[in-house]
């Protein structure tokens, strides 16, 4: 397993990505075809920036990527990507202005993850809280027909979370990329075709 992980780490370094997580997004795009040239994309939990770099490349010069993370990063981003260090749980004027500048979004992606404690229940609960925050950003900023990708730790509350997304999207899928560690509890939920919120 260590050799398997090292493969992705070395590949990321060779291809100038700051983290191996880029290959998870690459697999997600290959499976669900969520990216296109000219899109507006919001990347939550963006540091150190691999997903942002991949997204910027996929949307091209006519697209825009807004990357947000509570942590800073030294990664250099292309002109079509903007990185903002901010807490998504705090609606600061700077964060709201940055989010609203590119409205509407074609795609919102979230690789947000909590600092793990080793306590399974606590880690799952903290992951769910981040996923709920990402979901709450969707209604006012994702365009009709847009897509949503969110990382979540598997647990008893996942079904209820998925059910909430089914009320918002035409299709909702679970997907665990091959580049995820086999023993990892993380997987991704993909919402395709945003319809709005059912009343």
From Swiss-Prot:
This protein's GO CC annotations: cytoplasm
EC number: 2.1.1.166
Main localisation: cytoplasm
Keywords: Cytoplasm, Methyltransferase, rRNA processing, S-adenosyl-L-methionine, Transferase
Binding site for S-adenosyl-L-methionine: 49, 51, 69, 87, 111
InterPro entries in the record: RNA_methyltr_RlmE, RNA_MeTrfase_FtsJ_dom, rRNA-MeTfrase_E, SAM-dependent_MTases_sf
Catalytic residues (UniProt): 151
Keyword Endoplasmic reticulum: no
TM spans (from-to): none
Subcellular location, record wording: Cytoplasm
Reactions the enzyme catalyzes: uridine(2552) in 23S rRNA + S-adenosyl-L-methionine = 2'-O-methyluridine(2552) in 23S rRNA + S-adenosyl-L-homocysteine + H(+)
GO molecular function, one term: rRNA (uridine-2'-O-)-methyltransferase activity
Keyword Cytoplasm: yes
Entry function: Specifically methylates the uridine in position 2552 of 23S rRNA at the 2'-O position of the ribose in the fully assembled 50S ribosomal subunit.
PANTHER family: RIBOSOMAL RNA METHYLTRANSFERASE, RRNA METHYLTRANSFERASE 2, MITOCHONDRIAL
HAMAP family (UniProt xref): RNA_methyltr_E
Family: Belongs to the class I-like SAM-binding methyltransferase superfamily. RNA methyltransferase RlmE family.
Record-given protein name: Ribosomal RNA large subunit methyltransferase E
Organism: Maridesulfovibrio salexigens (strain ATCC 14822 / DSM 2638 / NCIMB 8403 / VKM B-1763)
Primary gene name: rlmE
């Amino acid at each position: 397993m260590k050799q398997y992980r090292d493969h992705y780490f070395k590949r990321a370094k060779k291809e100038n990505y700051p983290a191996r997580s880029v290959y998870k997004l690459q697999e997600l795009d290959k499976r669900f075809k969520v990216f296109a040239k000219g899109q507006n994309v919001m990347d939550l939990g963006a540091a150190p920036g691999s997903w942002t770099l991949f997204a910027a490349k996929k949307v091209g010069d006519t697209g825009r990527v807004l990357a947000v993370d509570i942590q800073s990063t030294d990664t250099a981003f292309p002109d079509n990507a903007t990185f903002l260090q901010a807490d998504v749980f705090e609606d600061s004027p700077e964060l709201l202005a940055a989010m609203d500048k590119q409205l509407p979004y074609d795609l919102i992606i979230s690789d947000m993850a909590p600092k793990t404690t080793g306590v399974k229940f606590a880690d799952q609960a903290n992951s769910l809280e981040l996923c709920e925050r990402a979901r709450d950003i969707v209604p006012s900023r994702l365009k009709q027909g847009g897509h949503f990708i969110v990382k979540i730790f598997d647990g008893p509350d996942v079904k209820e979370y998925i059910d909430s997304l089914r009320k918002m999207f035409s299709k909702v899928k679970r997907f665990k990329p091959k580049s995820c560690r086999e023993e990892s509890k993380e997987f991704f939920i993909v919402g395709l075709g945003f319809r709005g919120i059912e009343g």
